[in-house]
């Protein structure tokens, strides 16, 4: 039985995941991990959210939005060249997890703590 999960996004509107599709089931399982869920608490714009009341987006919302864009691009690519098919899981996973290693205050904390979010993403 296929289960659908819907995320309501301010930019992309409804982002639907279907567990009947193996690649989307993988994404749903990744979203449910503690490492990904912590992105809900990290502001997309870091300290700017303290100055601009409209800068409220999280790395969680951003990452799901990036996945949505990657899925649309993939669907277009596959229409023109079926050789892209074998890269679906890698593309989807990379799009979703690209910011997994971000710390508090986003890129600002990288300079303060000498920490690179790409390296932390790989470690996680």
Regions found by a protein language model. Name each.
Residues 36-46, 94-101:
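Active-site-adjacent bridging/hinge elements
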Residues 1-41:
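Non-catalytic interface/linker regions that flank or bridge core catalytic/transmembrane domains
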Residues 24, 47-48:
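Accessory alpha/beta interaction modules
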Residues 20, 60-64, 114-115:
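Generic detection of long, well-ordered alpha-helical segments
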Residues 86-124:
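Divalent metal-dependent catalytic cores for phosphoryl transfer on phosphate-bearing substrates
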Residues 22-25, 65, 120:
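Generic recognition of stable, solvent-exposed alpha-helical segments in well-folded globular domains
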Residues 45, 51-90:
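Alpha-helical phosphate/pyrophosphate-handling elements in metalloenzyme active cores
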């Amino acid at each position: 039985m296929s289960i659908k999960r819907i995320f309501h996004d301010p930019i992309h509107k409804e982002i639907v995941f279907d567990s009947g599709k193996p690649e989307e089931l993988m994404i749903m399982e990744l979203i449910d991990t503690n490492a990904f869920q912590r992105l809900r608490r990290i502001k997309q714009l870091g300290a700017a959210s303290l100055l601009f009341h409209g800068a409220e987006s999280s790395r969680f919302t951003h990452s799901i939005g990036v996945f949505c864009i990657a899925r649309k691009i993939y669907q277009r690519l596959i229409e023109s060249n079926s050789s892209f098919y074998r890269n679906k899981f890698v593309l989807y996973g990379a799009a979703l997890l690209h910011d997994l290693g971000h710390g508090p205050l986003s890129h600002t904390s990288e300079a303060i703590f000498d920490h690179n979010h790409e390296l932390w993403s790989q470690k996680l």
